[in-house]
């Protein structure tokens, strides 16, 4: 939330250059405040677990957030009851005519399937296209980030020979972006995927900015230069046990997965996992919600022309 300061205070210019959110007394006196409306398209198999993870992050800010849950179709989910889906999820036709401050599209266990072969690929494309006119800022996670980069910019991923699973060190590659406020020079983030994007092509694209990357895991946070789309290649929302649960699930299915890197104590899957990314995940979502949703979105959501992108 902003710090209200006197008009013309000398510190204002310094604070603003550091991406500290300050507001003059004059602006504060005329400020309209309302809850942020965020839509979540949940593509993960365990809907309730993913809902909990994302709501935990959204709830860790001082902003009031009104959340709608969206499903891709009305078919039964393998890991979630149809009653839960019918009671708490909306179909796209129910939100098509609405506008939202933010949209989160989750990952999906589709890493080895070509995009065009995904059963609901046309629905995904339709929702991505819709979001560009009806949502102030979109946060794409993991598979959704790859899918959106492919659909919006024609940048395809490359399949990996083995699943990239683990917790990896990342570094900032850009400065002076509000999204990176409070980030350490190096931080941890979890990954769980079968593909990766070509970081050189991402850096060369005139409409994209790579903000953070990992020597092992590649590009991590990529931002559209209009600040409307944020692509995160990992899973900052994961709880402590998620990589462990995925590892043992794959073992039970006879897939012979590799042990997630830098995750279990002493890299021993019989020992407890160590969560090193929770503070980063919380900061990432908080900064996105504050700087790229709350500060950019119009007060009247019926008029999306009121969006004012950050200058960078």
UniProtKB/Swiss-Prot annotation:
It is found in: Cytoplasm. Its EC number is 2.3.1.46. Substrate binds at residues 163, 192, 249. The record marks 111 as: Important for acyl-CoA specificity. It is an enzyme of class 2 (transferase). GO terms for molecular function: homoserine O-acetyltransferase activity; homoserine O-succinyltransferase activity. CDD domains: GATase1_HTS. GO terms for cellular component: cytoplasm. One of its GO terms (biological process) is L-methionine biosynthetic process from homoserine via O-succinyl-L-homoserine and cystathionine. It catalyses: L-homoserine + succinyl-CoA = O-succinyl-L-homoserine + CoA. The active site is at residues 142, 235, 237. It holds the Pfam family HTS. It comes from the Bacteria. The record marks 192 as: Important for substrate specificity. Keywords: Acyltransferase, Amino-acid biosynthesis, Cytoplasm, Methionine biosynthesis, Transferase. Pathway: Amino-acid biosynthesis; L-methionine biosynthesis via de novo pathway; O-succinyl-L-homoserine from L-homoserine: step 1/1. Transfers a succinyl group from succinyl-CoA to L-homoserine, forming succinyl-L-homoserine. Belongs to the MetA family. This is Homoserine O-succinyltransferase. It comes from Shewanella halifaxensis (strain HAW-EB4). The gene is metAS.
């Amino acid at each position: 939330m902003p710090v209200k300061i006197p008009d013309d205070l000398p510190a204002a210019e310094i604070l603003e250059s550091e991406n500290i959110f300050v507001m003059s007394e004059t602006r504060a006196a005329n400020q309209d405040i309302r809850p942020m409306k965020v839509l979540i398209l949940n593509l993960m198999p365990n809907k309730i677990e993913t809902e909990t993870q994302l709501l935990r992050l959204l709830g860790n800010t001082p902003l009031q957030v009104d959340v709608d849950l969206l499903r891709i179709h009305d078919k039964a989910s393998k890991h979630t009851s149809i009653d839960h889906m019918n009671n708490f999820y909306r179909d796209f036709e129910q939100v098509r005519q609405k506008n939202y401050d933010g949209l989160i599209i989750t990952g999906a266990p589709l890493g080895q399937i070509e995009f065009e072969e995904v059963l609901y690929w046309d629905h995904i494309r339709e929702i991505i296209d819709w979001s560009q006119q009806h949502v102030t800022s979109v946060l794409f996670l993991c598979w959704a980030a790859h899918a959106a980069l492919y659909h919006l910019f024609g940048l395809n991923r490359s399949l990996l020979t083995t699943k990239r699973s683990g917790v990896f060190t990342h570094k900032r590659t850009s400065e002076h972006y509000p999204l990176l406020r409070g980030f350490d020079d190096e931080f941890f983030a979890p990954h769980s995927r079968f593909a990766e994007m070509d970081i050189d092509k991402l850096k060369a694209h005139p409409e994209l900015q790579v903000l953070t990357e990992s020597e092992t895991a590649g590009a991590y946070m990529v931002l559209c230069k209009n600040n409307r789309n944020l692509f995160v290649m990992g899973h900052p929302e994961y709880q402590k046990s998620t990589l462990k649960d995925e590892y043992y699930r794959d073992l039970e299915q006879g897939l012979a997965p590799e042990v997630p890197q830098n995750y279990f104590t002493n890299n021993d899957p019989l020992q407890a996992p160590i969560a090193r990314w929770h503070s980063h995940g919380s900061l990432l979502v908080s900064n996105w919600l504050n700087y790229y949703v709350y500060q950019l979105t119009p007060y009247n959501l019926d008029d999306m022309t009121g969006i004012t992108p950050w200058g960078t």
